[in-house]
């Protein structure tokens, strides 16, 4: 088969989370290197600009009808996939996050008499939390087994999927990635002074503030750090646990040292002023925000769970601690904040690891090669 540009459909959640970020950046990079990319979702993914050459967005319209307690998004998505596949002559549809995208893609393929390849990328909670729920497991397993290709963002997630679902189809590990030309440390003395006017150290956390991120631990750990080291905590993002976290902050009496920044576009500017990035999650299938921090020369203190040990090297690019051990995590952060030389050395090692192993210019060609293998 002549390797001419492909016409690729991409379906993802358009929200503020790792799967949507990776799907968006993958599509944009595929377009930059010559492929035609069609995003199909209920809203424009937040990193997709209004216009970029060879990038198109197709909005899924969900019908509201009194008979439906819950609007049937998966059916509307299937119909839109078929419509776009026919009109744009798609070679394949690449869905990110299995539930419900993979089952919608399977139905679309059947409606197209099998003339459409399906690639499913597993990102984490689609398998570990949602897909493994008894209500969704049968359809998730069936849809995965009928995908033409499956990729996973970490070796941990690959093993977890095989064990949980008992499927026999091969799963290719293609890790998440960063663009090292974008995620690069910037000199921002004015921004730093805004948040730390008296030279305080800065600890940063970025997430969707869901229970799995353990915001309570973040506050507990920061309170322990703040007792000994003048520091500020920047909490970037938003989500269901914010109110509890605010209460917890008041209980500890550290409110004047904590800033909730909400959802931010200028992430690199914030990473660039951070001294430590903190990710004490219950589980992480990869930990994209940790990788982004590392690329900006920020050492990471995280939990030794899921795919995080595949990203963060303990004692070299940061520290990995036990889930819920607030004293261990506090000691790791204090060690980094007190020792400028160690912190800077770990930051440089973190940057080197990020650009050596998780570079967009190395990872996207792996997806490209994977597509060609399936199509041939």
Where on the chain are the PLM-derived regions?
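Short hydrophobic beta-strand element within catalytic cores of glycosyltransferases
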Residues: 299-302, 312
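N-terminal strand-loop element at the rim of the active site
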Residues: 12-16, 28-73
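Nucleotide-activated donor-binding/catalytic signature segment of Leloir-type glycosyltransferases, i.e.
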Residues: 246-262
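A short helix/loop element that forms part of the nucleotide-sugar donor recognition site in Leloir-type
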Residues: 184-197
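Carbohydrate-associated surface elements
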Residues: 156, 177
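Conserved acidic donor-binding segment of nucleotide-sugar-dependent glycosyltransferases
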Residues: 314-315, 319-326, 335-340
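Conserved donor-binding/catalytic core segment of Leloir-type glycosyltransferases
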Residues: 196-222
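Aromatic "clamp/platform" in nucleotide-sugar-dependent glycosyltransferases that forms part
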Residues: 263, 282
């Amino acid at each position: 088969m002549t390797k001419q540009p492909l016409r690729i459909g991409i379906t993802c959640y358009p929200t503020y989370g790792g799967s949507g970020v990776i799907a968006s950046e993958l599509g944009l990079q595929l377009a930059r290197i010559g492929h035609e990319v069609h995003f199909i979702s209920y809203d424009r993914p937040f990193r997709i600009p209004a216009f970029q050459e060879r990038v198109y967005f197709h909005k899924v319209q969900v019908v509201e009808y009194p008979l439906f307690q819950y609007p049937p998004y998966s059916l509307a998505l299937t119909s839109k996939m078929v419509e776009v596949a026919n009109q744009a002559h798609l070679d394949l549809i690449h869905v990110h996050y299995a539930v419900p995208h993979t089952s919608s893609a399977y139905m679309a393929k059947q409606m197209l008499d099998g003339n459409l390849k399906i690639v499913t990328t597993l990102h984490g909670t689609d398998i570990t939390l949602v897909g493994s729920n008894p209500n969704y497991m049968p359809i998730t397993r069936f849809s995965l087994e009928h995908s033409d290709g499956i990729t996973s963002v970490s070796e941990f997630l690959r093993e977890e999927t095989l064990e949980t679902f008992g499927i026999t189809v091969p799963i290719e590990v293609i890790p998440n990635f960063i663009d090292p030309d974008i995620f690069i440390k910037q000199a921002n003395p004015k921004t730093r002074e805004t948040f730390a006017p008296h030279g305080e150290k800065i600890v940063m956390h970025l997430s969707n503030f869901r229970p799995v991120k353990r915001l309570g631990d973040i506050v507990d750990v920061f309170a322990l750090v703040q007792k000994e080291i003048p520091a500020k905590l920047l909490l970037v993002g938003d989500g269901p646990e914010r109110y509890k976290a605010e209460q917890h902050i008041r209980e500890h009496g550290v409110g004047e040292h904590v800033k909730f920044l909400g959802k931010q576009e200028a992430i690199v500017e914030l990473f660039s002023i951070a001294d430590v990035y903190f990710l004490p999650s219950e589980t992480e299938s990869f930990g994209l925000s940790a990788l982004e921090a590392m690329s900006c020369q920020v050492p990471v203190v995280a939990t030794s769970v899921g795919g995080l040990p595949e990203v963060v090297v303990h004692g070299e690019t940061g520290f990995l601690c036990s889930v819920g051990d607030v004293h261990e995590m506090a000691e790791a952060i204090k060690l980094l904040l007190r020792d400028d030389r160690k912190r800077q050395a770990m930051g440089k090692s973190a940057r080197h690891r990020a650009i050596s192993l998780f570079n967009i210019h190395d990872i996207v060609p792996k997806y490209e090669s994977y597509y060609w293998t399936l199509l041939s």
